[in-house]
Amino acid sequence: MNVALGGTFDPVHDGHRALFERAFELGDVTVGLTSDELAPKTRHVDRYVRSFAERKRDLETELEPLAAEYDREFAVHELTEPTGIATEPRFDALVVSPETVDTGERINELREDAGVDPLDIVVVDHVIAEDGDVISSTRIVNGEIDEHGNVTPDRDGRDATR
């Protein structure tokens, strides 16, 4: 099975890791990583996002051990628009978080319009931080939690330029 998922992944956290693990359980994985131009447009909160090259490097570091563990292949492709690679016929499934289910449904509409079979949309629940809220990159960048969801009240967040 060929599995797709996409995002900005800045920084990678345990919520992303849950998505990656589920994807590798299903098959070979292709991750669409938002381009430098697209990344800020996908943010619900205006914040600095590291460069594509930095994010790709960190993402590959996360994916390599999972690929080895599940004996799967993976690739990272640049996304220049939100529906990205998932409209390509080679994919069978799309792994999404609860807030990106709508994007998955939109991708299936585009696939249907193009005469391509719909993807199985696999929803992975949020991972909850120790304070009971969802782990998110924005919360990490703001200094509220670390990548594992531990509360970090004494930590400063990332500033607007790093």
Task: Map each language-model feature to its residues.
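Nucleotidyltransferase catalytic core that binds NTPs
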Residues: 1-162
